[in-house]
Amino acid sequence: MSREVTSGLPQDKPTGSAPPPPPPWRRWLLPIGLLVSLVLLFTFPMRPSSGKTLTYSEFLTALHHHDIKTITIHSDGEASGQFADGRPYSTTIPIGLAGSQLLNELENNGVQISARPPGPSLASQVLAGVLSFLPFLLLLGLFAYSGRRAGAGFLAGLPGIGRARAKIFTTERPQTRFSDVAGYDGVKAEIAEVVDFLRSPERYRRAGAAIPRGVLMVGPPGTGKTLMARAVAGEAGVPFLSVTGSSFVEMFVGVGASRVRDLFEEARKHAPCIVFVDEIDAIGQRRAGAGTIVANDEREQTLNQLLAEMDGFEPAQGVVVLAATNRPEVLDPALLRPGRFDRQVTVPLPSQADRAAILRVHCRNKRLAPDVDLDAVARATPGFSGAELANLVNEAAIAAARAGRRDLTAEDFRYARDRIILGRREDSNVLLPSERHAVAVHEAGHAVVAACSENADPVERVTILPAGRALGVTFQLPLAERHLYSESYLRDSLAVRLGGRAAELEILGEASTGAVNDLSSATELALRMVREYGLSPRLGPVSYPVGGSMYLPGGQELTPRPYAEATQQRIDQEVADLLRDAEERARDIIRRNRQAVDELASLLLEQESVDGAVVYQLVGRPVPTPEEHREAAARHVRRPGIAAATGASMAGGSEPRTAASSDDLL
């Protein structure tokens, strides 16, 4: 059973029959009465006391005795002023008598005369008062409407603002099981072991083992961390509390720490249990140092409370915290130490075998045509996460439905892969004839250089059909999973990326802006070879990694440069030399295989897409096989003097995408 936690004191239920509720209109009487009173108060303010009230005869008598000093005549006949001794008075001048004769008499007696223009009418005063209170009325109505929609008014929700927004699963659990999580056998074993700790604690206590306090799952987005938590909730025989890290953040100070306390109080009531915190980096970021100018006291208070609850003076017994994040580098070290998060489980991008298993799970309720080989689809999608594979199957199903078929074909999966990587395809006729020829030459250059390079990934397909910003694409697929990249492989990769530009220079006589994406990716790879991988003889075996997220590519932290300006100049020179050497190698391959490039460009103009086997036939080389790849890989790894980029691939821990190169549309 799933319910929302808003813990508090239990309320006694009435035993007798409750009186009937008042009619709805009565609850509006008091607010309307107060509003009318305020309107009248501000519309008709009390006039100050006007002193002694005189009749018109008494006023004339005082005027003749020179007792009147000033007079102010109103448009409605009312008059007020001061006596000679300064006392105020008021009187009413009859209509028709406040003429020139009275004015002459007032002037003859030395009275200072003033007049007041007519004021607004009663209706206009009431209207002005209502309009002045209209914003207040609208705001009051908005609060009333929101309160009715939420089941309680704004003020009614304030007492529970410090309560944790956690969902508790006790009896009715999610339908997800570990069998629904394909692949990741090691990760599932670690997570299942924690569940077994809580199911059978005595077995571990007899061996002297302590139950881990926390398990942190880290990995790129879309790899199934939250899915793994849902599987734990479905498999666990203990209560499961689920909450997101952002739910602790609120506009009121102290609310985050209060919600952490309330969450663990609720967890202790259900112990033994599991607390799952998704996106824990929202509250677990590293605290500011002593000299830091910018700090977030509210977030740090929330983090401090979380640290105390997990392993403080009174730690939570029988409560295991399961958390997930794709930004482990920003978490506070105190949160990651043993005793809080005893285990860190990495959920990486799936391997080829894992991708095949994930595809089989998502294809359970779909009909596949005989030509569909899910192992081949898995090999064609290196670097895809579990979420992207689910999207791949869904896009293939959409393509089949669009064509009026129930069975998913291999072409549907190829279309879905291209759409995810590149975007929606366009017709090549959108290009000018000269542009279409330039794109064909460009892609032919990529394909021929890749086919003639010993260490490059094999060419799978070449196309000049525009998709997204790409005007053409050369697809390369590795024959096996790569975990280390040798220097020879990286240098051949540079030559392949610059092969399109080299073909333009050799055949067309000039380069174009279509190579901008190739230049960008080649420069980035060369920079990492020199600065991070230690593959520069001039710079030596040093590594200056660029700060940024481990699993979120694209962002870079503003960190101080750990080397001198002279070192930066050497890095720039080495990068330029690597790129020049790669371009010269690519141009040499194009010159030696000019006929193959011309024939492939003609085939692309005619067919728009050419299979990789045709490319190898044109250059006179056999299509690479997995056995040849394994022999070559073993030969390159054992070769002396060849350095490998250890610890991470050239994509920062993830496999490269299948689209090796593309023309960019500017």
Swiss-Prot record:
<keyword id="KW-1003">Cell membrane</keyword>
<feature type="binding site">
    <location>
        <position position="446"/>
    </location>
    <ligand>
        <name>Zn(2+)</name>
    </ligand>
</feature>
<comment type="similarity">
    <text>In the central section; belongs to the AAA ATPase family.</text>
</comment>
<keyword id="KW-0067">ATP-binding</keyword>
<dbReference type="InterPro" id="IPR037219">
    <property type="entry name" value="Peptidase_M41-like"/>
</dbReference>
<keyword id="KW-0812">Transmembrane</keyword>
<dbReference type="InterPro" id="IPR003960">
    <property type="entry name" value="ATPase_AAA_CS"/>
</dbReference>
<dbReference type="GO" id="GO:0006508">
    <property type="term" value="P:proteolysis"/>
</dbReference>
<comment type="subunit">
    <text>Homohexamer.</text>
</comment>
<dbReference type="Pfam" id="PF06480">
    <property type="entry name" value="FtsH_ext"/>
</dbReference>
<dbReference type="InterPro" id="IPR000642">
    <property type="entry name" value="Peptidase_M41"/>
</dbReference>
<feature type="transmembrane region" description="Helical">
    <location>
        <begin position="126"/>
        <end position="146"/>
    </location>
</feature>
<keyword id="KW-0482">Metalloprotease</keyword>
<dbReference type="Pfam" id="PF01434">
    <property type="entry name" value="Peptidase_M41"/>
</dbReference>
<dbReference type="InterPro" id="IPR003593">
    <property type="entry name" value="AAA+_ATPase"/>
</dbReference>
<dbReference type="InterPro" id="IPR003959">
    <property type="entry name" value="ATPase_AAA_core"/>
</dbReference>
<dbReference type="Pfam" id="PF17862">
    <property type="entry name" value="AAA_lid_3"/>
</dbReference>
<keyword id="KW-0479">Metal-binding</keyword>
<dbReference type="GO" id="GO:0030163">
    <property type="term" value="P:protein catabolic process"/>
</dbReference>
<comment type="similarity">
    <text>In the C-terminal section; belongs to the peptidase M41 family.</text>
</comment>
<feature type="region of interest" description="Disordered">
    <location>
        <begin position="1"/>
        <end position="23"/>
    </location>
</feature>
<feature type="topological domain" description="Cytoplasmic">
    <location>
        <begin position="147"/>
        <end position="666"/>
    </location>
</feature>
<keyword id="KW-0472">Membrane</keyword>
<keyword id="KW-0862">Zinc</keyword>
<protein>
    <recommendedName>
        <fullName>ATP-dependent zinc metalloprotease FtsH</fullName>
        <ecNumber>3.4.24.-</ecNumber>
    </recommendedName>
</protein>
<dbReference type="InterPro" id="IPR005936">
    <property type="entry name" value="FtsH"/>
</dbReference>
<dbReference type="InterPro" id="IPR041569">
    <property type="entry name" value="AAA_lid_3"/>
</dbReference>
<feature type="region of interest" description="Disordered">
    <location>
        <begin position="626"/>
        <end position="666"/>
    </location>
</feature>
<feature type="active site">
    <location>
        <position position="443"/>
    </location>
</feature>
<dbReference type="InterPro" id="IPR011546">
    <property type="entry name" value="Pept_M41_FtsH_extracell"/>
</dbReference>
<feature type="binding site">
    <location>
        <position position="442"/>
    </location>
    <ligand>
        <name>Zn(2+)</name>
    </ligand>
</feature>
<feature type="binding site">
    <location>
        <begin position="219"/>
        <end position="226"/>
    </location>
    <ligand>
        <name>ATP</name>
    </ligand>
</feature>
<keyword id="KW-0378">Hydrolase</keyword>
<comment type="function">
    <text>Acts as a processive, ATP-dependent zinc metallopeptidase for both cytoplasmic and membrane proteins. Plays a role in the quality control of integral membrane proteins.</text>
</comment>
<dbReference type="GO" id="GO:0005524">
    <property type="term" value="F:ATP binding"/>
</dbReference>
<feature type="topological domain" description="Cytoplasmic">
    <location>
        <begin position="1"/>
        <end position="27"/>
    </location>
</feature>
<dbReference type="Pfam" id="PF00004">
    <property type="entry name" value="AAA"/>
</dbReference>
<feature type="binding site">
    <location>
        <position position="518"/>
    </location>
    <ligand>
        <name>Zn(2+)</name>
    </ligand>
</feature>
<feature type="compositionally biased region" description="Low complexity">
    <location>
        <begin position="641"/>
        <end position="653"/>
    </location>
</feature>
<dbReference type="GO" id="GO:0005886">
    <property type="term" value="C:plasma membrane"/>
</dbReference>
<keyword id="KW-1133">Transmembrane helix</keyword>
<keyword id="KW-0645">Protease</keyword>
